[in-house]
Amino acid sequence: MIRAIVTDIEGTTSDIRFVHNVLFPYARERLAGFVTAQQFVEPVKTILDNLREEIAQPAAGAEELIATLFAFMDEDRKSTALKALQGIIWRDGYVHGDFTGHLYPDVLPALEKWKSQGIDLYVYSSGSVAAQKLLFGYSDEGDITHLFNGYFDTLVGAKREAQSYRNIAEQLGQPPAAILFLSDIHQELDAAEEAGFRTLQLVRGDRDPASHHPQVQRFDDIHPEQIPA
């Protein structure tokens, strides 16, 4: 029996184009000015210190760090420091109504149904926990954060490494076979499966011929009660 569902965001609950065409450009446009203005103010000061440690350059100044952050964005590097800074910038955008977090229309009814069935719901995304809470707190459907029991980001590990999912299962206090992981990326599902999770792949477009995981197009095609644990 599935007792917990862990869902990805990009391409799963939300259109990846929202992240790449709205969120990323919004943060990129404001990053340099934000870091320059906030570099000595918490929490940005600590985030930049962590970035210096990440790149092994303890004496790096603001200009150098900004150049590094732009390079990370160009590479789509899953840097915890970059994700934290983006999250702070995005918060202003959400709060000021510059955008709302995209949700596919089939997502909320399914989440509410699973919650009513006693299934615990979690999020696991490469975006920071703060950014995840913003997307669901200021979503197209309003604030739906009350539906989730918890959130995980890269602090628990990389999404293509099986140990990350073992860490999640340990934190949830559930046997891996009682946890269903939803993602649009088969390599992430491979890692979750290696850790003992049940898996389902969301394919919002064409099917993924390289994947051996069960594939569905919508959240209302998912029936946790029919998945053996």
From Swiss-Prot:
Cofactor(s) needed by this chain: Mg(2+)
Keyword Metal-binding set for record: yes
SUPFAM superfamilies (UniProt xref): HAD-like
Cofactor note: Binds 1 Mg(2+) ion per subunit.
Single Gene Ontology BP annotation: L-methionine salvage from methylthioadenosine
One Pfam family here: Hydrolase
Enzyme Commission number(s): 3.1.3.77
Catalyzed chemical reaction(s): 5-methylsulfanyl-2,3-dioxopentyl phosphate + H2O = 1,2-dihydroxy-5-(methylsulfanyl)pent-1-en-3-one + phosphate
CDD domains: HAD_EP (cd01629)
Pathway(s): Amino-acid biosynthesis; L-methionine biosynthesis via salvage pathway; L-methionine from S-methyl-5-thio-alpha-D-ribose 1-phosphate: step 3/6; Amino-acid biosynthesis; L-methionine biosynthesis via salvage pathway; L-methionine from S-methyl-5-thio-alpha-D-ribose 1-phosphate: step 4/6
Biased composition (Basic and acidic residues): 218-229
Region (Disordered): 206-229
Keywords, comma-separated and alphabetical: Amino-acid biosynthesis, Hydrolase, Magnesium, Metal-binding, Methionine biosynthesis
Keyword Nuclease in record: no
An MF annotation (GO) of this entry: acireductone synthase activity
UniProt subunit comment: Monomer.
Role summary: Bifunctional enzyme that catalyzes the enolization of 2,3-diketo-5-methylthiopentyl-1-phosphate (DK-MTP-1-P) into the intermediate 2-hydroxy-3-keto-5-methylthiopentenyl-1-phosphate (HK-MTPenyl-1-P), which is then dephosphorylated to form the acireductone 1,2-dihydroxy-3-keto-5-methylthiopentene (DHK-MTPene).
PANTHER family: ENOLASE-PHOSPHATASE E1
HAMAP family per the UniProt record, alphabetical: Salvage_MtnC
NCBIfam families: enolase-ppase, HAD-SF-IA-v1
Family the UniProt entry places it in: Belongs to the HAD-like hydrolase superfamily. MasA/MtnC family.
Protein name: Enolase-phosphatase E1
